């Protein structure tokens, strides 16, 4: 299973990751998947000057739903961005659907705006 996740990841040109923010972290299943695709010799390599990502030519879109408003400064979204940068991905985008718990009366509006942003991103993704 470990190698099948890695191989599946390597075969894709575009990756979309969608997750909730849980206690300032990502869900455990997403963490497990990231651990499976972070493989020395497959997605990064060791060099004399340190680790180097070898994943090239992929587009990654990370969509995260947050009850509060963090503007991309939460540890979970930073972790996801850091991992894919580490792997060598340079075409990385994030979309945040946030504030639904903070402003429940605006939840429909928040989701509508996020869908509009996603539609705009889809044009170039």
How should these model regions be labeled?
Residues 2-78:
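Helix-loop-strand module that forms the ligand-binding subsite of alpha/beta enzymes
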């Amino acid at each position: 299973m470990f190698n099948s996740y890695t191989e599946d990841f390597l075969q894709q040109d575009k990756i979309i990751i969608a997750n909730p923010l849980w206690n300032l972290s990502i869900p455990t299943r997403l963490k497990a998947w990231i651990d499976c695709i972070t493989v020395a010799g497959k997605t990064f390599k060791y060099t004399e000057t340190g680790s180097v990502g070898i994943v090239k030519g992929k587009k990654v879109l990370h969509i995260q739903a947050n009850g509060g408003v963090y503007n991309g400064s939460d540890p979970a979204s930073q972790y996801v961005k850091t991992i894919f940068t580490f792997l060598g991905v340079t075409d990385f985008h994030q979309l945040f659907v946030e504030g639904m718990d903070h402003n429940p009366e605006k939840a429909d509006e928040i989701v509508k705006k996020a869908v509009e942003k996603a539609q705009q991103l889809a044009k170039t993704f």
